[in-house]
Amino acid sequence: MTESRPCHKLKGIQAFRGFAILLIVMSHVVGRGFAFGGESGVCFFFVMSGFVLSMANDEKLRTGKFQTMRFVFHQLRKFYPLLALSLSFFVFAYWHAGYPVDYGKLLTNLLLIQTWFCSRHLVFSYVGSSWFLCDILVFYLFFKPLNRCIIGKSVKSLVLTWVAVVVIYAPFVFLIPSERFNYTLYSFPLFRLIDCCLGIALYRFVMSGEGERLSEQMDKKAYGWQSLILVVLLAFCLAFFAYRDVLPVNFRGVSFFWPFAVLFIFSGSADFSGW
């Protein structure tokens, strides 16, 4: 692999980060009629996390200076105080409204383990969005070995591994009842690790000789590629709305977005001169 790209390469991804945020916000504003926004935006964020963390920590990982627990505590300091404050507010609001405090829900929220139980009573309890923090924390804990495994594998081994993952994942898509989608495929930490690993694998490709050459070719025809990506983005949105009632939620809620997330993040990392 080539040497690490400058950090300014991450700037191109910011546009898609903003797009993902907009999708998630719209899903909460509109409600169930725009579930597409939350499902796709969350997928983009998980894949993006794998890619961005790999790029930002590339040198530390290569030199052995990356320390998992120091990294995890650094990340916790960023969001845990606000989470604790929000949780306190909601618990007090529920108590003030006459609802008894559910100490089981409170404890799982404080420990960020609510998504491990696949329970509709726990996953979105109190601070509903904290389920994402639970899953991303799991990724932080396993980031170093996952990165080492994916970056260090041969292309053949990596392809075979991904085939095995898809083969193992597919039965869950067909067997899990659709009404349990939100508490299993959508939020269970081990399932969402797949999204994050896609981001790491994408980073591996971007840093490879093939990825560099493709990025250079795209940069030479920046406006053409921008137009193509915008067309794909529009087609992506239109196709989803046209077929959302046909596709089962277990498929369209997560894995449907994987190829689109990879495409958009790769195009952002190309850092076109015209952007």
Question: Language model features by range: what are they?
Answer:
Residues 52-56, 136, 140-144, 148, ...:
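Transmembrane alpha-helices and membrane-interface helical segments
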Residues 1-174, 179-180, 221-223, 227, ...:
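Membrane-cytosol interface segments of multi-pass membrane proteins
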Residues 210-216, 271-275:
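Alpha-helical transmembrane segments
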Residues 196, 200, 224-275:
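Alpha-helical transmembrane segments of multi-pass integral membrane proteins
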Residues 99-101, 176-184, 212-214, 244-248:
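Membrane-interface helix termini and inter-helical loops of multi-pass transporters
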Residues 43-49, 112, 135-139, 191-199, ...:
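Hydrophobic core segments of transmembrane alpha-helices in multi-pass, intramembrane catalytic enzymes
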Residues 35-44, 181-190, 247-255:
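Non-cytosolic membrane-interface motifs at loop->transmembrane helix junctions
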